[in-house]
Amino acid sequence: MTMDDLDLRLLDGFQRDLPLETRPFAAIANRLNTSEAEVIARLARLRDEGLIARIGATCRPNTAGASTLAALRVPVRRIDKVAALVGAEPGVNHSYLREGSDWNLWFVATAPDAEALEESLVRIETATGLVPLSLPLVRAFNIDLGFPLIGPRRAMALDRPTDLDVLRPRDKALMQALTTGLALVPRPFVALGQALGRSEAEVISRIRALAAARILTRVGVIVRHRALGWCENAMVVWRLPEPAVEAAGTALAAVPGVTLCYQRRTVPGLWNWPLFCMIHARSRAEAMEVLVQARALPELQGVPHRILFSTRCFRQRGAVIAEVAA
């Protein structure tokens, strides 16, 4: 799979800030000095080749739905079986085997609400015979995951406050549809509106409102980073006291190469690492270079940490937000 300059500019420039207008692909074409038909054709090809997952949105955790990062301690001989059982749970949208901890199978569980999320974890426990470690999000410092394809690494934008008052009852179905993806047609918001029983204008208006409120953290091209060469994924966890987390997280999120950064709940006796960051890189050496920069931060000098590289990916897809996907 080879990409030319136009492919690279398309993927690099529109992982966020998809033009929210009636003909978004025409607007992209104008910026890239090409045609609407060419943009649509290229996106379709890149999707079919497995380089992009969808044109859609990512949603802030625990706004319209509920989610948690969870882990299991799985004996090596049971990895494949347990991973299959975890992956069979509808709300599991990411699942990785990681080295560097006894907690070796990590997954993100999502559900329409907290009660449904708890029921999902109970089903996983029953199916596997293993008790999940659940680490809900406490605070986000950067969750705007993107992958620069042109030029040097750059720091991700720091997170901004969320306005939950913007949410409306029918937004869940819209957000679920956006995690599935837009149709690659000249007027995709017409097609989306027809599926939801809403007008094109209303769909665009609600997406704009949800994006401005940071409930939708990104609207654009959702790439498959492994297929694009970002094959190393390091989850680095840091142990530091609660009063120090905010300053450390803010500084860590600003390091170029740190792709996600957030605080999660600790569990006494089981997990005492509250600060997490993700480093996606093209090689382990590249990931370790980013970690060297992170460890040099005044806020993190001497702070104990662990590096959990992923060794296998079992599942990666959009979140479950609504009871029935739109």
Swiss-Prot record:
Known pathway: Porphyrin-containing compound metabolism
Which EC class is this protein assigned?
Answer: lyase
Q: Which Pfam families match?
A: AsnC_trans_reg2, NirdL-like_HTH
Cystine links in this protein are: none
What Gene Ontology molecular-function terms does this entry list? lyase activity
Q: What is its EC number?
A: 4.1.1.111
Q: From which residue to which does any coiled coil extend?
A: none
InterPro entries of this UniProt entry?
AsnC_trans_reg2, HTH-Siroheme_Decarb, NirdL-like_HTH, Tscrpt_reg_AsnC-like, Tscrpt_reg_HTH_AsnC-type_CS, WH-like_DNA-bd_sf, WH_DNA-bd_sf
Q: How does it assemble?
A: Forms a complex composed of NirDL, NirG and NirH. All proteins are required for the total conversion of siroheme to didecarboxysiroheme.
Q: What does this protein do?
A: Involved in heme d1 biosynthesis. Catalyzes the decarboxylation of siroheme into didecarboxysiroheme. Siroheme is probably decarboxylated to monodecarboxysiroheme, which is in turn decarboxylated to didecarboxysiroheme.
Please state what the protein is called: Siroheme decarboxylase NirDL subunit
What is the source species? Paracoccus pantotrophus (Thiosphaera pantotropha)
This chain is encoded by the gene named nirDL
